Amino acid sequence: MCRDVRGRWSKGLAALSLCATVGVAHAQSSVSLYGLADAFAGVVRTPGSVGNAWEVGSGGLSTSFWGMSGAEDLGGGTKAIFTLESFYRINGGQSGAYNGQSFFGRRAFVGLSGESGQLTLGRNDSLLFVSTLLFNPFGNSFVFSPMVVHTFLGSAMGAAPVQSDTAIDDSIVYQSPEAGGLTASVLYSNAGIAGHVGQANYSANVLYFAGPFSATAAVQSLHTASLFLNGATEQTAWLAGAAYRLQTVKFYLQYERVTNNNELTDDTIQVGLSAQAGTGSILVSWAGTLRRPAQGADIRWSTVVLGYDYPLSKRTDVYAAWRYDTMTSVSSGNSVGAGIRMKF
Protein backbone atom coordinates (compact mmCIF):
# COMPACT_ATOMS: atom_id res chain seq x y z
CA MET A 1 0.00 0.00 0.00
CA CYS A 2 2.82 2.43 0.88
CA ARG A 3 4.67 1.76 -2.36
CA ASP A 4 1.50 2.51 -4.35
CA VAL A 5 0.93 5.79 -2.54
CA ARG A 6 4.53 6.90 -2.90
CA GLY A 7 4.60 6.06 -6.60
CA ARG A 8 1.53 8.17 -7.33
CA TRP A 9 2.12 11.06 -4.94
CA SER A 10 5.87 11.14 -4.49
CA LYS A 11 5.82 14.92 -4.37
CA GLY A 12 3.03 15.22 -1.81
CA LEU A 13 4.01 15.72 1.81
CA ALA A 14 0.55 14.64 2.95
CA ALA A 15 0.91 11.30 1.21
CA LEU A 16 4.33 10.75 2.75
CA SER A 17 2.83 11.43 6.14
CA LEU A 18 0.04 8.91 5.45
CA CYS A 19 2.57 6.27 4.41
CA ALA A 20 4.52 6.79 7.59
CA THR A 21 1.36 6.25 9.60
CA VAL A 22 0.46 3.08 7.70
CA GLY A 23 4.02 1.81 8.08
CA VAL A 24 3.77 2.10 11.87
CA ALA A 25 0.48 0.19 11.83
CA HIS A 26 2.02 -2.58 9.74
CA ALA A 27 4.98 -2.83 12.09
CA GLN A 28 2.60 -3.54 14.96
CA SER A 29 0.62 -6.29 13.24
CA SER A 30 1.32 -9.58 11.49
CA VAL A 31 -0.49 -12.23 9.45
CA SER A 32 0.78 -15.78 8.83
CA LEU A 33 -0.24 -18.43 6.30
CA TYR A 34 0.51 -22.03 7.27
CA GLY A 35 -0.77 -25.58 7.14
CA LEU A 36 -0.09 -29.29 6.90
CA ALA A 37 -0.38 -31.87 4.11
CA ASP A 38 -0.69 -35.56 5.05
CA ALA A 39 -1.43 -38.46 2.70
CA PHE A 40 -1.04 -42.22 3.09
CA ALA A 41 -1.50 -45.40 1.08
CA GLY A 42 -2.74 -48.65 2.55
CA VAL A 43 -5.69 -50.79 3.57
CA VAL A 44 -8.21 -49.67 6.21
CA ARG A 45 -10.58 -52.40 7.40
CA THR A 46 -12.59 -51.48 10.49
CA PRO A 47 -14.28 -54.09 12.73
CA GLY A 48 -17.39 -55.56 11.15
CA SER A 49 -16.50 -54.46 7.62
CA VAL A 50 -16.29 -56.89 4.70
CA GLY A 51 -13.27 -57.31 2.43
CA ASN A 52 -10.10 -55.30 1.97
CA ALA A 53 -9.79 -52.19 -0.18
CA TRP A 54 -6.49 -50.51 -1.03
CA GLU A 55 -6.75 -46.75 -0.89
CA VAL A 56 -4.88 -43.47 -0.95
CA GLY A 57 -6.19 -41.56 2.03
CA SER A 58 -5.81 -38.13 3.60
CA GLY A 59 -4.66 -37.49 7.15
CA GLY A 60 -2.97 -40.69 8.27
CA LEU A 61 -1.26 -39.10 11.27
CA SER A 62 -2.74 -35.58 11.14
CA THR A 63 -5.77 -34.20 9.33
CA SER A 64 -4.59 -32.01 6.43
CA PHE A 65 -5.41 -28.32 6.83
CA TRP A 66 -4.40 -24.80 5.89
CA GLY A 67 -4.93 -21.62 7.79
CA MET A 68 -4.12 -18.02 8.48
CA SER A 69 -3.75 -16.14 11.73
CA GLY A 70 -2.90 -12.62 12.70
CA ALA A 71 -2.23 -10.37 15.64
CA GLU A 72 -2.20 -6.63 16.24
CA ASP A 73 -0.38 -5.07 19.17
CA LEU A 74 -2.84 -2.82 20.99
CA GLY A 75 -0.34 -1.69 23.59
CA GLY A 76 -0.06 -2.45 27.27
CA GLY A 77 0.66 -6.12 26.58
CA THR A 78 -2.70 -6.67 24.84
CA LYS A 79 -3.13 -8.04 21.32
CA ALA A 80 -6.11 -8.48 19.01
CA ILE A 81 -5.92 -11.93 17.40
CA PHE A 82 -7.75 -13.95 14.75
CA THR A 83 -7.45 -17.46 13.30
CA LEU A 84 -9.14 -19.06 10.27
CA GLU A 85 -8.30 -22.71 9.54
CA SER A 86 -9.80 -25.09 6.99
CA PHE A 87 -9.51 -28.88 6.71
CA TYR A 88 -9.09 -30.49 3.29
CA ARG A 89 -8.75 -34.01 1.88
CA ILE A 90 -5.56 -34.09 -0.15
CA ASN A 91 -6.37 -37.42 -1.83
CA GLY A 92 -9.38 -35.94 -3.66
CA GLY A 93 -8.95 -32.19 -3.24
CA GLN A 94 -12.23 -31.73 -1.35
CA SER A 95 -12.61 -29.15 1.38
CA GLY A 96 -13.49 -30.28 4.88
CA ALA A 97 -12.44 -33.33 6.86
CA TYR A 98 -15.79 -34.87 5.83
CA ASN A 99 -18.70 -34.01 3.54
CA GLY A 100 -20.81 -31.16 4.84
CA GLN A 101 -18.26 -29.66 7.21
CA SER A 102 -18.08 -25.86 7.27
CA PHE A 103 -15.30 -24.28 5.21
CA PHE A 104 -13.30 -23.05 8.21
CA GLY A 105 -14.13 -26.22 10.12
CA ARG A 106 -10.88 -26.62 12.03
CA ARG A 107 -11.28 -23.36 13.91
CA ALA A 108 -12.35 -19.77 13.26
CA PHE A 109 -12.22 -17.11 15.92
CA VAL A 110 -11.32 -13.53 16.83
CA GLY A 111 -10.39 -12.25 20.25
CA LEU A 112 -8.03 -10.57 22.67
CA SER A 113 -4.88 -11.89 24.34
CA GLY A 114 -2.92 -10.35 27.19
CA GLU A 115 -1.47 -10.76 30.64
CA SER A 116 -4.90 -11.67 32.03
CA GLY A 117 -5.37 -14.54 29.58
CA GLN A 118 -7.05 -15.00 26.22
CA LEU A 119 -10.69 -14.56 25.18
CA THR A 120 -11.90 -15.77 21.76
CA LEU A 121 -15.30 -15.85 20.03
CA GLY A 122 -16.28 -18.04 17.06
CA ARG A 123 -15.73 -21.71 16.25
CA ASN A 124 -13.32 -22.76 19.00
CA ASP A 125 -11.54 -26.04 19.68
CA SER A 126 -13.44 -28.57 21.77
CA LEU A 127 -11.49 -28.55 25.04
CA LEU A 128 -12.20 -32.26 25.43
CA PHE A 129 -10.58 -32.87 22.04
CA VAL A 130 -7.51 -30.85 23.06
CA SER A 131 -7.01 -33.02 26.14
CA THR A 132 -7.56 -36.14 24.03
CA LEU A 133 -4.95 -35.40 21.35
CA LEU A 134 -2.21 -34.15 23.69
CA PHE A 135 -2.06 -37.30 25.81
CA ASN A 136 -1.81 -40.17 23.35
CA PRO A 137 1.20 -41.06 21.16
CA PHE A 138 -0.72 -40.77 17.85
CA GLY A 139 -2.02 -37.25 18.56
CA ASN A 140 -5.07 -36.23 16.53
CA SER A 141 -4.98 -39.07 13.97
CA PHE A 142 -8.47 -40.21 12.95
CA VAL A 143 -6.96 -43.31 11.31
CA PHE A 144 -4.32 -44.62 13.72
CA SER A 145 -4.97 -43.04 17.14
CA PRO A 146 -7.01 -45.61 19.13
CA MET A 147 -8.21 -42.97 21.61
CA VAL A 148 -9.39 -40.54 18.93
CA VAL A 149 -11.03 -43.31 16.89
CA HIS A 150 -12.84 -44.75 19.94
CA THR A 151 -14.00 -41.31 21.11
CA PHE A 152 -15.03 -39.42 17.98
CA LEU A 153 -15.85 -41.98 15.25
CA GLY A 154 -18.87 -44.20 14.77
CA SER A 155 -18.28 -47.93 14.30
CA ALA A 156 -20.03 -51.30 14.19
CA MET A 157 -20.72 -50.60 17.87
CA GLY A 158 -23.00 -47.73 16.81
CA ALA A 159 -22.70 -43.95 17.11
CA ALA A 160 -19.48 -42.38 18.36
CA PRO A 161 -19.30 -42.06 22.16
CA VAL A 162 -18.76 -38.27 22.03
CA GLN A 163 -21.40 -36.48 19.97
CA SER A 164 -19.47 -33.34 19.03
CA ASP A 165 -17.00 -32.24 16.40
CA THR A 166 -13.40 -31.28 17.19
CA ALA A 167 -14.51 -27.63 17.34
CA ILE A 168 -17.74 -26.07 18.60
CA ASP A 169 -19.69 -23.36 16.76
CA ASP A 170 -20.96 -20.12 18.30
CA SER A 171 -18.67 -20.47 21.30
CA ILE A 172 -16.77 -18.26 23.71
CA VAL A 173 -13.52 -19.53 25.24
CA TYR A 174 -11.46 -18.05 28.04
CA GLN A 175 -7.95 -19.40 28.66
CA SER A 176 -6.11 -18.39 31.80
CA PRO A 177 -2.48 -17.28 31.78
CA GLU A 178 0.06 -20.00 32.58
CA ALA A 179 1.02 -20.25 36.25
CA GLY A 180 3.49 -22.85 37.49
CA GLY A 181 2.90 -25.00 34.43
CA LEU A 182 -0.90 -24.90 34.85
CA THR A 183 -3.47 -23.41 32.47
CA ALA A 184 -7.27 -23.62 32.61
CA SER A 185 -9.86 -23.00 29.89
CA VAL A 186 -13.65 -22.77 29.82
CA LEU A 187 -16.03 -22.83 26.83
CA TYR A 188 -19.68 -21.83 26.49
CA SER A 189 -21.93 -22.14 23.44
CA ASN A 190 -25.65 -21.55 23.04
CA ALA A 191 -25.67 -23.91 20.03
CA GLY A 192 -26.64 -20.95 17.84
CA ILE A 193 -30.30 -21.01 18.96
CA ALA A 194 -31.42 -17.80 20.66
CA GLY A 195 -33.63 -18.25 23.70
CA HIS A 196 -32.87 -21.95 24.08
CA VAL A 197 -30.59 -21.88 27.10
CA GLY A 198 -31.29 -25.56 27.76
CA GLN A 199 -29.50 -26.43 24.53
CA ALA A 200 -26.24 -24.80 25.58
CA ASN A 201 -22.91 -26.63 25.49
CA TYR A 202 -20.26 -26.31 28.18
CA SER A 203 -16.66 -27.46 28.29
CA ALA A 204 -13.60 -26.97 30.48
CA ASN A 205 -10.11 -28.37 30.84
CA VAL A 206 -6.91 -27.94 32.79
CA LEU A 207 -3.44 -28.67 31.42
CA TYR A 208 -0.30 -29.13 33.51
CA PHE A 209 3.24 -29.35 32.13
CA ALA A 210 6.25 -29.49 34.46
CA GLY A 211 9.49 -31.20 33.48
CA PRO A 212 8.97 -34.84 32.47
CA PHE A 213 5.40 -34.98 33.87
CA SER A 214 2.21 -33.62 32.33
CA ALA A 215 -1.48 -34.13 33.07
CA THR A 216 -4.95 -33.02 32.05
CA ALA A 217 -8.58 -33.18 33.10
CA ALA A 218 -11.55 -32.20 30.93
CA VAL A 219 -15.33 -32.17 31.00
CA GLN A 220 -17.87 -31.52 28.23
CA SER A 221 -21.65 -31.23 28.54
CA LEU A 222 -23.81 -31.24 25.40
CA HIS A 223 -27.55 -30.59 25.02
CA THR A 224 -29.88 -30.66 22.02
CA ALA A 225 -33.61 -30.27 21.37
CA SER A 226 -33.55 -33.09 18.80
CA LEU A 227 -31.66 -36.39 19.11
CA PHE A 228 -27.96 -37.14 18.98
CA LEU A 229 -26.97 -40.03 16.72
CA ASN A 230 -26.97 -42.23 19.82
CA GLY A 231 -30.60 -41.36 20.59
CA ALA A 232 -29.92 -39.10 23.60
CA THR A 233 -30.62 -35.38 24.12
CA GLU A 234 -28.04 -34.74 26.86
CA GLN A 235 -24.48 -36.01 27.20
CA THR A 236 -21.58 -35.49 29.62
CA ALA A 237 -18.01 -36.64 29.01
CA TRP A 238 -15.21 -36.72 31.58
CA LEU A 239 -11.56 -37.33 30.70
CA ALA A 240 -8.32 -37.57 32.69
CA GLY A 241 -4.89 -38.09 31.21
CA ALA A 242 -1.23 -38.11 32.16
CA ALA A 243 2.15 -38.55 30.51
CA TYR A 244 5.68 -39.07 31.80
CA ARG A 245 8.97 -38.92 29.93
CA LEU A 246 11.72 -41.26 31.13
CA GLN A 247 14.85 -40.50 29.13
CA THR A 248 13.99 -41.51 25.52
CA VAL A 249 10.60 -43.08 26.31
CA LYS A 250 7.34 -41.23 26.98
CA PHE A 251 4.41 -43.06 28.59
CA TYR A 252 0.74 -42.08 28.16
CA LEU A 253 -2.44 -42.92 30.08
CA GLN A 254 -6.05 -41.74 29.56
CA TYR A 255 -9.46 -42.62 30.98
CA GLU A 256 -12.79 -41.32 29.69
CA ARG A 257 -16.40 -41.84 30.73
CA VAL A 258 -19.33 -40.66 28.59
CA THR A 259 -22.87 -40.75 30.01
CA ASN A 260 -26.15 -39.99 28.21
CA ASN A 261 -29.69 -39.34 29.42
CA ASN A 262 -30.89 -42.48 27.59
CA GLU A 263 -28.77 -44.61 29.98
CA LEU A 264 -26.08 -45.34 27.38
CA THR A 265 -22.59 -45.28 28.95
CA ASP A 266 -19.14 -45.61 27.36
CA ASP A 267 -15.92 -46.18 29.31
CA THR A 268 -12.59 -45.95 27.45
CA ILE A 269 -9.01 -46.40 28.64
CA GLN A 270 -5.86 -45.78 26.61
CA VAL A 271 -2.25 -46.70 27.39
CA GLY A 272 0.65 -45.99 25.08
CA LEU A 273 4.25 -44.97 24.62
CA SER A 274 6.60 -43.29 22.20
CA ALA A 275 10.25 -44.35 22.16
CA GLN A 276 13.17 -42.89 20.26
CA ALA A 277 14.64 -45.44 17.85
CA GLY A 278 17.50 -43.99 15.87
CA THR A 279 16.42 -40.73 14.30
CA GLY A 280 12.74 -41.70 14.41
CA SER A 281 10.20 -42.79 17.02
CA ILE A 282 8.33 -46.03 17.70
CA LEU A 283 4.68 -45.37 18.60
CA VAL A 284 2.50 -47.88 20.45
CA SER A 285 -1.05 -47.40 21.73
CA TRP A 286 -3.93 -49.56 22.94
CA ALA A 287 -7.48 -48.44 23.72
CA GLY A 288 -10.41 -50.43 25.04
CA THR A 289 -14.03 -49.29 25.21
CA LEU A 290 -16.88 -50.88 27.14
CA ARG A 291 -20.34 -49.78 25.98
CA ARG A 292 -23.28 -50.37 28.32
CA PRO A 293 -26.53 -49.78 26.41
CA ALA A 294 -29.88 -49.26 28.10
CA GLN A 295 -31.03 -52.56 26.61
CA GLY A 296 -29.11 -55.56 25.35
CA ALA A 297 -25.67 -56.94 26.06
CA ASP A 298 -22.53 -54.94 26.71
CA ILE A 299 -20.16 -54.36 23.78
CA ARG A 300 -16.36 -54.43 24.05
CA TRP A 301 -14.04 -52.81 21.50
CA SER A 302 -10.26 -53.15 21.59
CA THR A 303 -7.72 -51.47 19.28
CA VAL A 304 -3.94 -51.76 19.24
CA VAL A 305 -1.67 -49.74 16.93
CA LEU A 306 2.06 -50.02 16.27
CA GLY A 307 3.78 -47.31 14.22
CA TYR A 308 7.07 -45.71 13.28
CA ASP A 309 7.60 -42.03 12.47
CA TYR A 310 10.81 -40.89 10.76
CA PRO A 311 11.69 -37.20 10.21
CA LEU A 312 13.24 -36.28 6.86
CA SER A 313 13.63 -32.64 7.94
CA LYS A 314 12.19 -30.20 10.46
CA ARG A 315 8.98 -29.98 8.42
CA THR A 316 8.63 -33.34 6.68
CA ASP A 317 8.32 -36.87 8.06
CA VAL A 318 7.33 -40.30 6.78
CA TYR A 319 5.46 -42.91 8.78
CA ALA A 320 4.07 -46.43 8.77
CA ALA A 321 1.47 -47.95 11.09
CA TRP A 322 -0.45 -51.19 11.67
CA ARG A 323 -3.81 -51.28 13.47
CA TYR A 324 -5.78 -54.27 14.74
CA ASP A 325 -9.36 -54.11 16.10
CA THR A 326 -11.58 -56.62 17.85
CA MET A 327 -15.23 -56.05 18.81
CA THR A 328 -17.98 -58.12 20.37
CA SER A 329 -19.98 -60.20 17.85
CA VAL A 330 -18.38 -58.78 14.67
CA SER A 331 -15.35 -59.62 12.56
CA SER A 332 -12.00 -58.12 13.50
CA GLY A 333 -10.43 -55.18 11.71
CA ASN A 334 -6.94 -55.11 10.25
CA SER A 335 -5.43 -51.92 8.79
CA VAL A 336 -1.99 -50.92 7.56
CA GLY A 337 -0.67 -47.77 5.93
CA ALA A 338 2.40 -45.70 5.13
CA GLY A 339 2.46 -42.01 4.38
CA ILE A 340 4.18 -38.65 4.28
CA ARG A 341 3.40 -35.50 6.23
CA MET A 342 4.68 -32.00 5.49
CA LYS A 343 4.18 -28.79 7.45
CA PHE A 344 4.24 -25.43 5.70
Language model: regions and residue ranges:
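Repeated loop/turn-to-beta-strand initiation elements of outer-membrane beta-barrel proteins
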Residues: 78-80, 116-119, 181-184, 212-217, ...
